[in-house]
Amino acid sequence: MARVAVLHNTLDFQGGADVVCLSVCAALQAEHAVTLYTVSETDPGGLAARFGIDLDTTALDVRMPTGADPLARLLSAVAPAVGPQLALRSVLLRRTVGGELGAFDLVVSTANEVSLPTPSVQYVHYPQFRTHRLPDGDGGGLNRVWSRLAAPRPDDLGDGTALLANSAWTAGVTETVYGVRPSVLHPPVDPIEGRRAWDERRDGIVVVGRLAPDKRIRDAIRIVDGVRARGHDLSLHVVGAAPRAYRRYVRRVESMADERPYVTVERDAPRARLEELLCTHKYGLNCKPEEHFGMSVAEYVASGMVAFAPDSGGQREVLDGRENRLFGSVEEAVDLIAAAAAADDPPALPPDRFGSERFRRGIRDAVARAL
């Protein structure tokens, strides 16, 4: 049994990266002593229950640096004005716990690449440092500062480091930044039990995920407006986590919903309620372009829905590049969903493409090789 440290900058945004973090902890617990380092307000056990992850919280050693509680609250409070500051959080975590990492046999970073003094497995959702090397972004001057403090050098990502990415698209972006291409290990999304037959489902759309500006929930409402204007009586159900950092945006979304009797918003619904919605509605919609993987899109597929998403990022892989499910604008999304509603065809993609056992096996194999 090895001592393994898992580094995760924060669980407070309650999204796909946090599913990966808690799934990694769960995958390694049976064979290793796992310690989770994070700067979070969010309780790992409660979040694991919401995501349906079988995590033994009594066996998980959760450690937060001194002052982490007020720091997490402060960063959540200012996030509406300054953004999530994920790279800063990673820098703070790395520098405050770095002196403890030498006591571990292996470090696993589940929140992107970082410079580490030990052998490591690093799971990249999207490169957080040296973003000025990308063709369409520089990350601002602060990202260059954070990069000097905590970014790995390309040489650091060779022997002794197993680099993984959540999609082939993210692997390509990482290669552009560092000259090293990670292996692809898609995040875990199990088929959801209780899937209704197609003709027993409601003529409605579900939007799942963090209620945040980058998810473009208001565009989803506009898309449903457009589909209804074409004569299709579809409802919209928005359900997801509402982190404190996005409270102003959530109020704007709820204000739009209040003006439309066919739109419902549910904050922080339990997992059972989320699965009920996914298994009883026909269509799933994601509106964030260049989603690094697309956990919500994968959940739509896993629950037997017909899923739609922007024609960019890792979600192209989730939807197998199907042109009639991928859109480039609100108007094109209206066209595709209206056509699907008229045809009323059931989904064609299998629900078990991204099962959690595949993910757990991939993580355990990567850790075994690194050890």
Model-found features: residue ranges?
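Active-site donor-binding segments of glycosyltransferases and PAPS-dependent sulfotransferases
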Residues: 35-109
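Aromatic "clamp/platform" in nucleotide-sugar-dependent glycosyltransferases that forms part
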Residues: 289
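Glycosyltransferase donor-sugar binding loop
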Residues: 235-251
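Conserved donor-binding/catalytic core segment of Leloir-type glycosyltransferases
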Residues: 164, 189, 195-215, 221-226, ...
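A charged, aromatic-enriched C-terminal amphipathic alpha-helix characteristic of glycosyltransferases
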Residues: 341-371
